[in-house]
């Protein structure tokens, strides 16, 4: 990429001293130290105190930097005792320093860093005080105590004298905001979908309590290298000192800044850095994505530039872009001789990456530092004294961003084999050779760790981590981090480590869960969501013709961003939905601040009428890009999302290829590994297991293994038994049914039973018999089965003594109820009497035995009789036994007609 040489600012231009956001620069003579122009200051003599009170104070060491320092500052009015401890967590393992040779070859060095010289601490006697200093070249940094802020810097031509400049003496240099603006007091929590809010709140407290780690790379451009006297080591130390201050600012938010690399463009700029901050920002972000990310893994990158940006801007960063490949970064103008100035600006721009908006009066933010003492870091208008704390609004904005899914990369604990400056028990980091580290013995509250030796106490398995409870590891499958949105994946304890696995989320391009969109960097962006953000509840995207007509103009109100010449770019037809967002409905005016302008466009239709398109032009400050543009990752067509203001196919992410390896039983995560369903095992979800992935741990707890195995064994046994039954089915059928009586056969046989009463005689067995026989197997109705009945002839032709056996119901009444059967002229008039004595009176005359035995299945008999009604004359009807009611006559009881059996 061609280099754009930095333009030298005129000598009369002042250093801009305010934070990011539109800030006015006070004018000062170039070349004079700002510290010489700020009015009164105190001269302090510094000495290093020894633990032995009898040893006099020593000078601050220039090369040897102990782990712990106690420094005495002797002032004219009082003495201050500073307790300092080296910031061991500032530098991660694998930290690199990169510079370039004259031919452009990059040189990356990984040093042992025995010259660690960056400290955090407090003023003795004031627990609320804050100290952030470096001792690389004398004492330099900030001191906050008794609600006052001081800046400490070495004096020239001396080794033990320092300037202690109070904040009050710096109020004559004040930056003003070039535009009174604010994104709004409407946070993202207010406009996110209700279901997502409820799911996010369940994990809100857990997320906020967890420590977040920003793996940061700081780059100095060529102009910054020149401003620091072309001293490579001086530039590197300055960048690390800036990171040390920023880490101190963010600690109250439970965020740690971990420096993974510094880079100095000591030969030429690697991308175009000009006085246009917008162009410089996007050039740097493009270089980061294409060049820096492939060779150095990190979460965020910030450029410290020696170029004076035009206008009032001293920094710029995209809003809520942390962890994204395209926009996680910012540019900062080094506007002060002290590294503290650039550190505050970097903290401000990093806040925008976190989703923090400017603090304004209309938001009603609470700040514990008064404006005359610096105020808060996200103030849009500030200057000396530098702000060093965050407001309540910033905390709320951060919480809302985390709930929405921003910052998926922040929950990964950086690898620390040996902290910056060497291993030390008591620094709070578990380093190589340590089992635990809970800090110094006087501050350790961990009952599982021995603070003196950094070893576990007896019977303790672990001491730290979300998967450690009561000094023991939680069982595998225990949830340790829930999903925060529709594109996030939960994490579970593995049972082998005390820390929760690194955060993972759905692969870019994967459809959102329950939302019409695609996941991108762990967030589901949609046009509808952005319309609600701009216009409030009830807003929705406008028809496609609005995007096409408005964004083809290439002006401030309809465009696809800016081109390399900082001119508004027209949108191609295919990219129209990736330009300025077009909405309908919602509030009468944008809800995102007083500087938001409504742009309404009416498009006539051929059939009559007009389509109203509502866009916005929002000026949120020089340090924030236009929020009215469609966000990266938003769905612009089926199978496509917006990337770099272009509507591109999701296949560029490789999501389909990745999903194929999961066999339809899981989804692909951002590390291109399968996250399997609960009963399938990673890595490919093709075997039974406990779900999850190799990155996030098992979904189900392993203590269910015994139950699962038992169920599987039972199923296998049942299958084996069923197979044996199938093979021996004929033998079993003969054994079960050849010598057994069916239920209806038992009804026909004479067995003891309850004597039926008169009123129920005709229906006692009607309904049960019918239901039973309807389910009977058809083969029981064959003639062979009918002839095999053993008790039927005895029951009909030779009845037992009625006095010994209770009266049974007549089987034919089950099939042929009297109320449905027409009576024959000579048939019996009444049913059998209830008293057995009646049958004794007719014992002289016996009815003729039936010509055929009764069938085995009386219910099926009806259909058989129906088909057999056509008979030869004189053929006797089978199965109907006359029911005598009086002494039988001498003649045979007439047979009923054929119609008597028709139903």
UniProtKB/Swiss-Prot annotation:
Motif SH3-binding, residue range(s) on this chain: 824-830, 830-837, 846-852, 852-858, 881-887
UniProt short sequence motif Cysteine switch, positions renumbered to this chain: 175-182
Primary enzyme class: hydrolase
UniProt entry tagged with the keyword Phosphoprotein: yes
Swiss-Prot/TrEMBL cofactor(s): Zn(2+)
EC number from the UniProt entry: 3.4.24.-
Subcellular location: Membrane
Membrane topology: Single-pass type I membrane protein
GO biological process: cell adhesion; proteolysis
GO cellular component, as recorded: nucleoplasm; plasma membrane
Molecular function per GO: metal ion binding; metalloendopeptidase activity; SH3 domain binding
TM segment ranges: 707-727
Glycosylated residues in this chain: 112, 147, 157, 182, 185, 450, 649
Keywords: Cell adhesion, Cleavage on pair of basic residues, Disulfide bond, EGF-like domain, Glycoprotein, Hydrolase, Membrane, Metal-binding, Metalloprotease, Phosphoprotein, Protease, SH3-binding, Signal, Transmembrane, Transmembrane helix, Zinc, Zymogen
Topology Extracellular: residue spans: 206-706
Annotated positions of the Phosphotyrosine modification: 901
Residues on Cytoplasmic side: 728-903
Cofactor detail note: Binds 1 zinc ion per subunit.
UniProt function note: Involved in skeletal muscle regeneration, specifically at the onset of cell fusion. Also involved in macrophage-derived giant cells (MGC) and osteoclast formation from mononuclear precursors.
Name of the protein: Disintegrin and metalloproteinase domain-containing protein 12
């Amino acid at each position: 990429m061609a280099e754009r040489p930095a333009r030298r600012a005129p000598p009369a231009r002042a250093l801009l001293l305010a934070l990011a956001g539109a800030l006015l620069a006070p004018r000062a003579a170039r070349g004079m130290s700002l510290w010489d122009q700020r009015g009164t200051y105190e001269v302090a003599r510094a000495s290093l105190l020894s633990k032995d009170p009898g040893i006099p104070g020593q000078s601050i060491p220039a090369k040897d930097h102990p782990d712990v320092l106690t420094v005495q500052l002797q002032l004219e009015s009082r003495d201050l005792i500073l307790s300092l401890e080296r910031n061991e967590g500032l530098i991660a393992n694998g930290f690199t320093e990169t510079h370039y040779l004259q031919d452009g070859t990059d040189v990356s060095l990984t040093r042992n860093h025995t010259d660690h010289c960056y400290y955090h601490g407090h003023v003795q006697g004031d627990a609320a005080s804050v100290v952030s200093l470096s001792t690389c070249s004398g004492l330099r940094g900030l001191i906050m105590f008794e609600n006052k802020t001081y800046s400490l810097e070495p004096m020239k031509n001396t080794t033990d004298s320092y300037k202690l400049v109070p904040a009050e003496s710096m109020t004559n240099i004040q930056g003003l905001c070039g535009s009174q603006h604010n994104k709004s007091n409407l946070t993202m929590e207010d406009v996110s979908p209700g279901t997502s809010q409820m799911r996010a709140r369940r994990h809100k407290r857990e997320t906020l309590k967890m420590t977040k780690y920003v793996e940061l790379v700081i780059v100095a451009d060529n102009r910054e290298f020149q401003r620091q006297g072309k001293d490579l080591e001086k530039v590197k130390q300055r960048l690390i000192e800036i990171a040390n201050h920023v880490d101190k600012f963010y600690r109250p938010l439970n965020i740690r800044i971990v420096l993974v690399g510094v880079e100095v463009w000591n030969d030429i700029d690697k991308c175009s850095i000009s006085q246009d901050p917008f162009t410089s920002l996007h050039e740097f972000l493009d270089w980061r994505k294409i060049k820096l990310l492939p060779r150095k893994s990190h979460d965020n990158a910030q450029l410290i530039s020696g170029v004076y940006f035009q206008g009032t801007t001293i920094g710029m960063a995209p809003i809520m872009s942390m962890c994204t490949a395209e926009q996680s970064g910012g540019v900062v103008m080094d506007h002060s001789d002290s590294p503290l100035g650039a550190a505050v600006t970097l903290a401000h721009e990093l806040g925008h990456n976190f989703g923090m908006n400017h603090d304004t009066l209309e938001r009603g933010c609470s700040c514990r530092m008064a404006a005359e003492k610096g105020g808060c870091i996200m103030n849009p208008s500030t200057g000396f004294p530098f702000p060093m704390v965050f407001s309540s609004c910033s905390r709320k904005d951060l919480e809302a961003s985390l709930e929405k899914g921003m910052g998926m990369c922040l929950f990964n604990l950086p690898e620390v084999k040996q902290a910056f400056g060497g291993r030390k028990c008591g620094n709070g980091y578990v380093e190589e050779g340590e089992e635990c580290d809970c800090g110094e013995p006087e501050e350790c509250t961990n009952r599982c760790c021995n603070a003196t030796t950094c070893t576990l106490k007896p019977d303790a398995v672990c001491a730290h981590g979300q998967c450690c409870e009561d000094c023991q590891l939680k069982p595998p499958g225990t949830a340790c981090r829930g999903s925060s949105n529709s594109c996030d994946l939960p994490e579970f304890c593995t049972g082998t480590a005390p820390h929760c696995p690194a955060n993972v989320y759905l692969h870019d391009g994967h459809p959102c869960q329950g939302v019409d969109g695609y996941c991108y960097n762990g967030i589901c962006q949609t046009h509808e969501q952005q319309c609600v953000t701009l216009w409030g509840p009830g807003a929705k995207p406008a028809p496609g013709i609005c995007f096409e007509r408005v964004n083809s103009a290439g002006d401030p109100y309809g465009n696809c961003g800016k081109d390399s010449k900082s001119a508004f770019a027209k949108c191609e037809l295919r990219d129209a939905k990736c330009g300025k967002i077009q909405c309908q409905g919602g509030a009468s005016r944008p809800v995102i601040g007083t500087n938001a302008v409504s742009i309404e466009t009416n498009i006539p239709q051929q059939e009559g009428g007009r389509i109203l398109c509502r866009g916005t032009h929002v000026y949120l400050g020089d340090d924030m890009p236009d929020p009215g543009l469609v966000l990266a990752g938003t769905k612009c067509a089926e199978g496509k999302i917006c990337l770099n203001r272009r509507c591109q196919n999701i296949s560029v992410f490789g999501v389909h290829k990745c999903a194929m390896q999961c066999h339809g039983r899981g989804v692909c995560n951002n590390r291109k590994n399968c996250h399997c369903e609960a009963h399938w095992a990673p890595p490919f979800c093709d075997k039974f297991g406990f779900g999850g992935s190799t990155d996030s741990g098992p979904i189900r707890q392993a203590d269910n293994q015994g139950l699962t195995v038992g169920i599987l064994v039972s199923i296998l046994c049942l299958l084996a038994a069923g197979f044996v039954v199938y093979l021996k089915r004929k033998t079993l059928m003969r054994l079960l049914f050849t010598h057994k009586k069916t239920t209806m056969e038992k009804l026909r046989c004479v067995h003891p039973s309850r004597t039926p009463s008169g009123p129920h005689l005709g229906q006692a067995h009607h309904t049960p018999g019918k239901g039973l026989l309807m389910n009977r197997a058809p083969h029981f109705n064959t003639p062979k089965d009918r002839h095999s009945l053993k008790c039927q002839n005895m029951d009909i032709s030779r009845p037992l003594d009625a006095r010994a056996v209770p009266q049974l119901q007549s089987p034919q009444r089950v099939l042929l109820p009297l109320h449905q059967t027409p009576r024959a002229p000579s048939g019996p008039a009444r049913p059998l009497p209830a008293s057995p004595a009646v049958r004794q009176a007719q014992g002289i005359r016996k009815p003729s035995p039936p010509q055929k035995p009764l069938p085995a299945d009386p219910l099926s008999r009806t259909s058989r009789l129906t088909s057999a009604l056509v008979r030869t004359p004189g053929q006797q009807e089978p199965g109907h036994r006359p029911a005598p009611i009086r002494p039988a006559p001498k003649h045979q009881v007439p047979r009923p007609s054929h119609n008597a059996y028709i139903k």
